[in-house]
Amino acid sequence: MGTYNLVSQNNISVKNSSNEPLKFPWAGGMNSMQYCELDLNLDGVFDLLSFDRRGNRKLCFINKGLEGIADYEYDAQYSSLIPDISDWVITVDYNLDGKKDIFTYSPGYAGIIVYKNISDQELKFERVVYPYLKTMFPGGYVNLFVTYADYPGIADVDGDGDMDILTFGVLGSFIDMHKNMSMEKYGNADSLDYEHYTYCWGHVAESDESNHIYLDTCFSGGKNYKSLQTPRHSGSTFLVHDLDDNGLVDILLGDVEFPWLYALYNTGTIDDAHISYMDTLFPGSTDEINMFSMPVAAYIDVNNDGLKDLIASPFDPGITNSQDKRSVWYYKNTGHNTNPDFEFISEDFLQKNMIDMG
């Protein structure tokens, strides 16, 4: 019997139905996508780390665009330089050294793994927490609880320069804030020293049966929605950013089995957040995000104009909850970074240049 050698050919050109060539037909398609900014080739320009939760696939795109132009080139070689990612990924520069670090889910522990970016001549990461990120409760340090079904918010919530974490707690429908104490204790942001700050950030609660939001709750003086005795349904996504230019972070919230993002606006103070109103048709009544299930949002500069744009895709990896040809929605920011105005551009960002067989 003869022998055969199989050779991968990824340079075969493919055209779409309009007879236009696809830029990266063999990248493998996209389904339930998460997008992060990361300088992959160390040229000082943010590229795209894309993560498909269906299959835990890493797809890397080099930024080739000029100012005001979105132009990306798929480059598979960088995927092997990215640490293992499971279920979700967020890149933030937690130690303020100018390099984006990686936060991802810790399989088996319902927690967070952190990889510090130690790139010099090549892209390189070092794991800095074992086996998971911890937070201080009154009884001592414990696992900072985040499930595989939730996408946490990691941002400077209190304005002191280090990265805090917002997520739903173990029980109940309230938002936990884990405050990073690095600046308070050490005078710099290079430590991951967390302390549970409040179990009811924003005075807001989510129904344990739907995506209904209850405002002005949790504490005396408000409508006490519910005790913490009943576990909520699992599955929510956070994007934490100032959306109305008042100096306070707001939330874009996605929820399992629901196709929208709700914008929750914070009108409280740095020390005591208070969600007082919300937009259920974000980012607009004629072009609101409306997917099969549970959008997750990314706030990144897609077209190199200095303004953060909005990318949304289903977080739920279920095969019936994303559509492989139009599951990455791109909204261009025509406003400001802390007061964005989003214009809908396409529902197939990057994936329109790929073959996806299912």
Give residue ranges: language-model regions:
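Beta-propeller-forming repeat regions
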Residues: 1-358
